[in-house]
């Protein structure tokens, strides 16, 4: 399962970020709570911004990289939970996303960063910037954990 985490991270992260929009199309249990058009536009703009690497030239700083990556994953889990409670995400979508995101937390460690090479190191270097989101870095530097 860990080998698939980063390959699935972009779709899972986007699911958590776009749950209010996506839930309207996949909600099975009950009708979704509709979002006003301007809110849907804001969600799409935020998701697009979070999917883009903002700063590529940061030096590798493992403590900062792990802190940023873990914070990003934890935030996605919290947003998913809030969207589930608020009726914007189905239980099935939440159940599909959370195990992989929770497993990812176990992979993101300072020791892993310090031993990283290649694309894995590039991911941690990307996460060394406070301006980058874990979704963007995972998308730009996908690796097998």
Language model: regions and residue ranges:
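Short N-proximal segments of mature Sec-exported proteins
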Residues: 41-106
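Bacterial N-terminal signal peptides
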Residues: 10-20
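Short N-terminal segments immediately surrounding and downstream of signal-peptide cleavage
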Residues: 27-44
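Compact alpha-helical subdomains of small soluble proteins
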Residues: 88-145
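Boundary at the C-terminal end of the N-terminal hydrophobic targeting segment
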Residues: 22-26
